[in-house]
């Protein structure tokens, strides 16, 4: 019996953490095995991402996904029937071929990725093994260092503060569970500081605290340091700070300037680099994402020349999980790390290939969720399957975030003594030497 062959493919509309529709796909094999994938969605999206297909009609403010679902059920499903689910690369190649566009704009990356995710889960379930083991084999045992949002700003909090994410990374913990406990303590300490200052504690899209009453972006850095200390840790020794600037959101491509609306400042690229460099000198910052715009290659190069040996510089909107854009970054020596988002490229195979390309060229992969998330935990398994070493899924609150952190805790327990946790050693591959504080 060829139980490993695909018997049916079914897509449906479900909802993400921002109450927007998204695509869920079930793939059933001939032996009855089922795999399921739910597609995430971003708020601040790069210009060069694979195209997420939305209906553009009155329902759901134009964000319906009935067209993408129709494409799965009517166009993709018939051509996936009887395929061997064990051959993920062949399935993804067929999905790409059926769409026929370089950015998956005809059928929608959300339609294609849903099928790709469901197929890999069906394959893992067919063999009755965890997804990280199915995709990564016996060598998949490196647990990711968590990058956890404490304050959510930018597009995740109605732009009440310009910087999108203020995060912490545990650097002294010997295990994932101990590292995650540290960031939870910092998160709760930050809430206490907000309450003590009489500020309402609201929650941003990814579970971080809503930055109420800030007069400057730098206040977020000061609050993180205070929170780390209140939790009983030493900033720069036990935990470092990470920032997602998401600078494309406030970049003016015509003038080549950056507008910090909170402070009513307009900065040249040189001034923007100078501001970030000053922050790195004055605070225990060990990672900056999208410090300069996706359209500002010159600015990104200036930032890398200034900070590339001191801290991790992550390209998200700049690279969009796309090997050709990462190749350009490698050739120009821009950044030293790549944010990995499945829906930016659109299939599991392409995502894994991008991670491998990143690692092979001395850059650090950081597997990431989106602001519109669900209970789906594929990215956790993907991070461990590829030994990526870092995971960014939002904060320590909201169940679509904790679902993923909890999945890492379960995998850590399952791996037992074979689990490897790199702690701050994860940054060594990029030749980063952190400042001492």
UniProtKB/Swiss-Prot annotation:
Its annotated pathway? Carbohydrate degradation; glycolysis; pyruvate from D-glyceraldehyde 3-phosphate: step 4/5
Task: Tell me which Pfam families the record gives.
Answer: Enolase_C, Enolase_N
Cellular compartment(s): Cytoplasm; Secreted; Cell surface
Does this entry carry the keyword rRNA-binding?
no
Reactions accelerated catalytically: (2R)-2-phosphoglycerate = phosphoenolpyruvate + H2O
Q: Which domain of life is it from?
A: Bacteria
Any note on cofactor binding?
Binds a second Mg(2+) ion via substrate during catalysis.
Q: Which keywords accompany this UniProt record?
A: Cytoplasm, Glycolysis, Lyase, Magnesium, Metal-binding, Secreted
Could you say which residues bind (2R)-2-phosphoglycerate here? 164, 341, 370-371, 392
Its Enzyme Commission number? 4.2.1.11
Gene Ontology annotations for the cellular component aspect, listed alphabetically: cell surface; extracellular region; phosphopyruvate hydratase complex
- Tell me which residues bind Mg(2+): 244, 289, 316
Cofactor(s) listed in the protein's UniProt record: Mg(2+)
Biological process according to GO: glycolytic process
UniProt GO MF annotations: magnesium ion binding; phosphopyruvate hydratase activity
Chief location of this protein within or outside the cell: cytoplasm
Which residues participate directly in catalysis? 206 (proton donor), 341 (proton acceptor)
Keyword tRNA-binding attributed: no
Q: Which HAMAP family is this protein grouped with?
A: Enolase (MF_00318)
Annotated function: Catalyzes the reversible conversion of 2-phosphoglycerate (2-PG) into phosphoenolpyruvate (PEP). It is essential for the degradation of carbohydrates via glycolysis.
Recorded family membership: Belongs to the enolase family.
Can you name this protein?
Answer: Enolase 1
Give the source species.
Desulfitobacterium hafniense (strain Y51)
